[in-house]
């Protein structure tokens, strides 16, 4: 009997992944995937993309972004032989479960989730103009989680409220109809985000402050050269602040030569080293770190049929999991068996 605990996580296909994804989620995903304790489900959440990107040209872009996200995942080590990788929109059971769950939670409860307003603000949507789909985004996310019967969900602090809503929905369903769903728990990694190269909040595509896993060596060097450091350090002889300085945050994470990093910090505090020297070494380490990832990514993108096969295989596996869950839901919910054949 399989005693492994299920974990579900994923990404919206809005473009290429960046170092913030690596620090905040991918590194943790690899540890979970390679642990004997967990079965991992990785969802490419294309339906979630539609909640804030519904224009025709944006929808058409999703297909290309699906391949990019998948190539990024595979290039960093997400393994389809160890994990289930699937496309959200190709799982019809998600739609049904989303609808059922929408009956089990109030609008006020959903609207109380802080990240919902943040999403609207980032998409330049006024609160009074929120679409039904965007309001229902957290419920759709609950359907993703509970369809897989995930017991753990790796999220940052800004998304903990989504998992708590999922727990409420699972609790409500189990109380009303009978035990089907686990109440998932938050699983946090060592780090949940990475500051952007501009020093203004976490790294993100929308903030234009990201270094992408696929950036060229020249682009990486240029982005690091422009990286925000200590604004009060006017010249190299001015003692600089290390704490909270993006330059040293990145060195701590990506430079494996810890003695060198500590030497840089000491000299920086004393005003005995130029920013450009510290930045040059960071660029070298980032280029070295990303080189094998970029090589594998290029190889995967050159074989779109192989990527398609990976996604199809994983989606078929998830369909089997989904069917088992929905059989239990139908039985507990009380749908008549005599009409079940109409669903096939």
Curated annotation (Swiss-Prot):
It holds the Pfam family tRNA-synt_1b. It is found in: Cytoplasm. The keyword Thylakoid does not apply. GO terms for molecular function: ATP binding; tryptophan-tRNA ligase activity. Signal peptide: none annotated. Gene3D superfamilies: HUPs, Tyrosyl-Transfer RNA Synthetase. This is Tryptophan--tRNA ligase.
């Amino acid at each position: 009997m399989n005693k492994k605990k299920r974990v579900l996580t994923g990404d919206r296909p809005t473009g290429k992944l960046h170092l913030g994804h690596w620090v905040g989620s991918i590194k943790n995903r690899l540890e979970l995937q390679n642990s004997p304790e967990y079965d991992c489900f990785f969802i490419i959440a294309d339906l979630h993309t539609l909640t804030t990107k519904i224009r025709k040209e944006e929808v058409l872009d999703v297909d290309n972004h699906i391949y990019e996200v998948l190539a990024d995942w595979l290039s960093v080590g997400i393994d389809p032989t160890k994990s289930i990788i699937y496309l959200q929109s190709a799982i019809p059971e998600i739609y049904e479960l989303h609808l059922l769950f929408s009956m089990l939670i109030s609008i006020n409860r959903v609207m109380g989730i802080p990240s919902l307003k943040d999403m609207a603000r980032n998409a330049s949507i006024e609160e009074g103009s929120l679409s039904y789909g965007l309001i229902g985004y957290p419920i759709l996310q609950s359907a993703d989680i509970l369809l897989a019967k995930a017991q753990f969900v790796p999220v940052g602090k800004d998304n903990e409220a989504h998992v708590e809503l999922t727990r409420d929905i699972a609790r409500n369903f189990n109380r009303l109809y009978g035990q089907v769903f686990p109440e998932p728990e938050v699983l946090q990694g060592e780090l949940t985000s990475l500051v952007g190269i501009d020093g203004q909040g976490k790294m993100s595509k929308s903030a234009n402050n990201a270094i992408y896993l696929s950036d060229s060596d020249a682009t990486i060097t240029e982005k690091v050269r422009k990286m925000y450091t200590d604004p009060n350090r006017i010249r190299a002889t001015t003692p600089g602040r290390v704490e909270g300085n993006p330059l040293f945050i990145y060195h701590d994470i990506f430079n494996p030569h810890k003695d060198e990093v500590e030497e840089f910090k000491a000299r920086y505090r004393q005003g005995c080293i130029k920013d450009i020297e510290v930045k040059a070494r960071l660029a070298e380490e980032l280029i070295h770190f990303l080189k094998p990832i970029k090589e594998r990514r290029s190889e995967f993108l050159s074989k779109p049929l192989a990527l398609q096969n990976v996604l199809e295989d994983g989606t078929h596996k998830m369909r089997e999991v989904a069917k088992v869950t929905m059989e239990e839901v139908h039985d507990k919910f009380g749908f008549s068996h005599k009409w079940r054949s109409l669903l096939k």
